[in-house]
Amino acid sequence: MQLGLTSEQSVAEAVKQISSAVARFNPQLDHSQFLIERQLASPITELIVSVRQDSQFGMALTLGSGGILAELLEDVVTLLLPASTAEIHAALKTLKIAALMDGYRGQTKVDLPALSSSLYNITQFMQHNPEKIMELEINPLFVYQQQICAVDALVYTNAET
């Protein structure tokens, strides 16, 4: 993987380097196809978002500091579902990273009502598909002022459906 490529020429050079490295590693591997994606701008913060079935308590939403901070800060809150947008909003405000979302040191603020609404929609999707999806974890969820982007996600489905 290569990051920070800013021109067509730098992308072409990266493709050559990676293709050559793959061919040296294993000549039998197909090294003719590449996935090239736009690099995302740095977010205001990163969240971990998890919705899973608990055998004892039912469906639960866990929110916390995401990305590399997930284990470092041990900053999580769990809500039993169903939870309202207001409850999700209140839970977000209890996180250590809430100050970042509130414009810490003059930085851009996150639209917390919009973020809460988006997270609520995720919980609604999960609650309406419990027989198909057992667990969803997004880490990190990039949080910008007016939008979010799931950078990496893991979905456990029910193999029987």
PLM features: residue spans?
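ATP-dependent carboxylate/acyl-activation modules
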Residues: 1-161
